[in-house]
């Protein structure tokens, strides 16, 4: 087993069930490779495993991967083992391919899972040539793919590199999207847009500056507003993500965030409930403040797959936070201007018509499940 949970709690994960023979801590690429090639478990760095006598052993940690070009292209594996048409994300063109150009994130957001558990806070990147070579392979060998998504935690962290990659993508003639922080300069955004950028996935999180300070977001709403306006001017679409229930949340800050979302007005949004994952600063804070009991599993989703509020406060209960989620979505989407924006897209594209109808069905299914 791999991932953030076992990276943070290898002992507890192995002790929880005999069904797991080993877990890969830290970065698991080459750990998995060595296990698959038959290396003795006791010799594999970064591995925790169950010994023949039933005891749990922890090998030395695996050094962090510095040369990201050592990683093989993932796109040929997609082509070999997956039918990409079977995978759908509402804000991306269909079908799409998702790849990473680097690992780690310089930001210190207290809630964010992967940089605090596996990837680290140093952005280690593949060379520009290596990235463009894989995108060219996708273009030439997977003609059905309509968009490439760069899934790095913050693809826009290194401006000159982003601009160089963008110019290379422009020459390849591909459509692409990426994760971005809401502080990318106008000139960089312009170069990205001119070279095939379609959409940015942006974590706004909250409309309250004190909450952004509390979670160490590294920017305030003034910067994000300017960024959003720049995207509008350039015709860059934005899928915005927000979080309810972060430290400092009140009824008033929730209202502030809903209004803020309507002001910056991404094309589409995702609203999450604060999740204190083990290994994150938010988890430690939640335990210290008594918002969460240590070592007690927090229910993050219901049996029906609907997300739940894991932490609450004396002045704002988990139940109240949970119900504000539905309110947020309704007030953002059920506006005449937003409805017309979506309908207008549908009228000019049969592909967009199918996508938005599918999203609409899923949205109303979510509302029914949430109300239940």
Where do the protein language model's features map onto the residues?
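Structural motif
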Residues: 1-4, 179, 241
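Flexible glycine/acidic-rich beta-alpha junction loops that bind and position SAM and/or redox cofactors
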Residues: 8-12, 107, 111, 210, ...
């Amino acid at each position: 087993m791999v991932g953030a949970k076992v990276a943070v709690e290898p002992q507890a994960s192995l002790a929880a069930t005999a069904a797991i023979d080993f877990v890969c801590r830290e970065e698991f690429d080459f750990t998995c490779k060595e296990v698959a090639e038959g290396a003795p478990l006791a010799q594999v760095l970064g591995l925790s495993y169950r010994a023949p006598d039933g005891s749990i052993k922890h090998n030395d940690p695996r050094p962090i991967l510095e040369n990201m070009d050592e990683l093989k292209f993932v796109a040929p594996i997609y082509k070999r083992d997956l039918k990409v048409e079977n995978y759908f994300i509402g804000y991306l063109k269909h079908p799409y391919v998702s790849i990473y150009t680097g690992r780690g994130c310089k930001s210190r957001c207290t809630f964010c899972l992967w940089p605090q558990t596996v990837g680290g806070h140093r952005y280690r990147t593949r060379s520009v040539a290596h990235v463009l070579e894989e995108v060219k392979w996708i273009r030439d060998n997977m003609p059905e793919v309509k968009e490439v998504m760069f899934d790095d935690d913050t693809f826009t962290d290194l401006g000159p590199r982003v601009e160089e990659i963008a110019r290379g993508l422009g020459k390849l003639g591909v459509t692409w999207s990426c994760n971005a922080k809401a502080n990318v300069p106008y000139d960089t955004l312009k170069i990205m847009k001119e070279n095939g950028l379609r959409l940015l996935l942006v974590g706004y999180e909250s409309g309250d500056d004190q909450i952004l300070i509390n979670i160490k977001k590294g920017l305030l709403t003034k910067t994000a507003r300017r960024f959003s306006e720049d995207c509008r001017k350039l015709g860059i679409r934005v899928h915005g993500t927000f979080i309810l229930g972060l430290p400092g949340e009140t009824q008033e800050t929730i209202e502030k965030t809903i209004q803020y979302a309507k002001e910056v007005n991404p094309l589409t949004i995702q609203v999450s409930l604060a999740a204190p994952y083990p290994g994150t600063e938010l988890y430690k804070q939640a335990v210290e403040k008594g918002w969460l009991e240590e070592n007690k599993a927090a229910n993050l989703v219901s049996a029906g797959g609907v997300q739940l509020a894991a932490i609450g406060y004396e002045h704002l209960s988990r139940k109240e936070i949970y119900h504000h989620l539905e309110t947020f979505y309704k007030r953002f989407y059920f506006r005449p201007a937003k409805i017309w924006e979506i309908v207008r897209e549908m009228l000019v594209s049969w592909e967009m018509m199918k996508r938005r109808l599918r999203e609409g069905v899923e949205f109303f299914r979510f509302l029914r499940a949430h109300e239940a």
